[in-house]
Swiss-Prot record:
Similarity comment text for this entry: Belongs to the major facilitator superfamily. Proton-dependent oligopeptide transporter (POT/PTR) (TC 2.A.17) family.
Gene that encodes the chain: dtpT
Functional description taken from the UniProt entry: Proton-dependent uptake of di- or tri-peptides.
UniProt KW keywords: Cell membrane, Membrane, Peptide transport, Protein transport, Transmembrane, Transmembrane helix, Transport
SUPFAM superfamilies the UniProt entry points to: MFS general substrate transporter
Protein known as: Di-/tripeptide transporter
PROSITE patterns attached to this UniProt entry: MFS (PS50850), PTR2_1 (PS01022), PTR2_2 (PS01023)
GO annotation terms (biological process): oligopeptide transport; protein transport
Origin species: Lactobacillus helveticus (Lactobacillus suntoryeus)
TM helices/strands, residue ranges: 3-23, 26-46, 57-77, 84-104, 119-139, 155-175, 199-219, 227-247, 294-314, 321-341, 372-392, 452-472
Topology in the lipid bilayer: Multi-pass membrane protein
Length: 497
């Protein structure tokens, strides 16, 4: 929906769009994306204090459906902002609470709990694969071009409304059978007096915002850029207020404070300049399809590993099959950087399937801290290698066995043996002496910086471990170690490249 909404805003009117400039359309999308994540704070509070997660998710789904119905109406800019407002509020109600509904299907000890979340993620990404095909098909006239040469974006928006309608029907019918009655009530119901006080402050804030917007309009400063600035201030102030309330509340336990840093990730979502760059990724639907395909493969393998008896043996065989498929995708379709980073994630998933105690035997206590810096050091090495490969592309060198190798045709040696000493080999004929000097200088700087980087990561890791053992449940620390373990097959993966 976000991709087609962007096109809808800046396509010419003659092509079925609104005729906005690309800058304005991108700015509106940034506002939309930021408000979605800000609204989740409100949705979580309403679920915990007023309605309960089950009702909150339902209300959110209804508002999202209504927002897409409004978008499906060919009323131009008049209804655009109203529909976005409905979708923002609806997403804020649904997004933070729907995962809670999935978790409520099973007890904490039930081994099917993780598989349930994998099915949930599988369904989301399955929809992400279907949508880039189905929406253009509808916009172009359902395969028979009933709209002529124009794109009918409203037909695409209507599909989202129809999908949400059937989702709500299934949610209501299935909820009566599978969802617990506890989800119908809030976890920490608010007193009537406190609720009235909250409503009073909400009304005051809304009036203040309207007054600010009216004042900006009065002096001719009501523009998209200025609205973004206003929202940026709000995006900074609201999380700070949220943290203050969390730390001051007597209802928040020490363990719950252990995950208080999670909302900090909001800053990456709410930084508008980064948000503008993210829009370019939205437009690249083909790459999005590949990414969602990869996530579905991951979800399937995790579900299989949990639900199938003797999961270690079966999961390893299934994972090998997934790796073979992913190798083919990576070598033929996906850009190099995307493949390497995605494979790194997949390889860490592999640690979930190791026999109990296998990793512990190979990991010494004193080296655990070092494992946490595997990813940043690997990425740094990757940058060095790519930089060196660019310099040496097409040139000849000899591998460790004395066999002549062309870097462009056989990059394996470039990734397994490249280091600063490689540039000193007589067999390398660089394009010019000054390139060699610059390369040596830059690479020496990066290698010298390793000492500082390692010291910093050791300190950060030790601080993080102390904090984790003090505040985070043991299971969370364990999972963290699972994903920060030494990557033994990374070398093999790079050889495949």
């Amino acid at each position: 929906m976000r991709a087609i909404l962007l096109f809808y805003m800046y396509y010419a009117v003659t092509k079925g769009g609104l005729g906005m400039s690309q800058t304005t359309a991108a700015s509106i999308m940034s506002i939309y994306g930021s408000l979605v994540y800000l609204s989740t704070l409100v949705g979580g509070w309403l679920s915990d204090r007023v309605w309960g997660s089950r009702k909150t998710v339902f209300y959110g789904g209804v508002l999202i459906m209504l927002g897409h119905i409004v978008l499906a109406l060919p009323a131009g800019v008049t209804v655009l902002y109203r529909s976005i407002a409905l979708i923002v509020v609806g997403t804020g109600l649904l997004k933070p609470n729907v995962s809670d509904m999935v978790g409520g299907l099973y007890s904490v000890e039930d081994p099917r709990r993780d598989a349930g979340f994998s099915i949930f993620v599988f369904g989301i990404n399955l929809g992400s694969i279907i949508a880039p095909w189905l929406v253009p098909w509808a916009a172009q006239g359902f395969g028979v071009h009933i709209f002529g040469s124009q794109l009918n974006f409203h037909a695409g928006f209507s599909l989202a409304a129809v999908g949400m309608f059937f989702g709500l029907v299934q949610y209501v019918l299935g909820g009566k059978k599978y969802l617990s009655t506890e989800s119908l009530t809030p976890n920490d119901p608010i007193d009537k007096g406190d609720l009235l006080n909250v409503i009073k402050w909400v009304v005051i804030i809304i009036i203040a915002i309207v007054a600010i917007l009216a004042a900006m309009a009065g002096v001719g400063q009501l523009s998209v850029d200025n609205v973004i600035t206003l929202l940026t201030i709000l995006a900074i102030a609201l999380p700070i207020y949220y943290f203050v309330m969390m730390f001051r509340s007597s209802k928040v336990t020490k363990i719950e404070l252990g995950i208080h840093l999670l909302p900090v990730s909001l800053k990456n979502r709410l930084f508008f300049k980064k948000g503008y760059k993210r829009l370019k990724q939205i437009i690249q639907l083909e790459l999005a399809i590949k990414r969602q395909s990869f996530i579905i493969l991951i979800a399937l393998i995790i579900m299989a590993s949990i639900l199938i008896p003797n999961k270690v043996i079966i999961a390893k065989h299934l994972l090998k099959l997934v790796l073979l498929v992913f190798y083919w995708i990576g070598l033929n379709l996906i850009p190099f950087s995307t493949f390497v980073l995605s494979f790194l994630f997949l390889d860490y998933i592999k640690h979930m399937f190791k026999k109990e105690g296998e990793q512990a035997k190979k990991t010494k206590e004193k080296s655990r801290i070092h494992h946490g810096i595997e990813i940043p050091l690997f990425l740094r090495q990757l940058i060095i290698n790519i930089f060196t490969l660019i310099i040496l592309e097409g040139e000849t060198l000899f591998d460790e066995n004395g066999v002549e190798v062309n870097i462009a045709e056989h990059p394996v040696q470039g990734y397994t043996e490249l280091n600063i000493n490689l540039l000193n080999k007589d067999s390398i004929d660089l394009w010019a002496d000054w390139i060699q000097s610059v390369a040596k200088y830059l690479l020496n700087i990066m290698y010298t910086a390793d000492v500082i980087v390692i010291i910093i990561f050791y300190l950060v890791k030790m601080a993080a471990l102390w904090w984790a053992w003090s505040y985070i449940p043991l299971s969370t620390v364990f999972v963290g170690y699972k994903y920060s373990g030494k990557d033994e097959s990374l070398q093999a993966a790079l050889e495949v490249l």
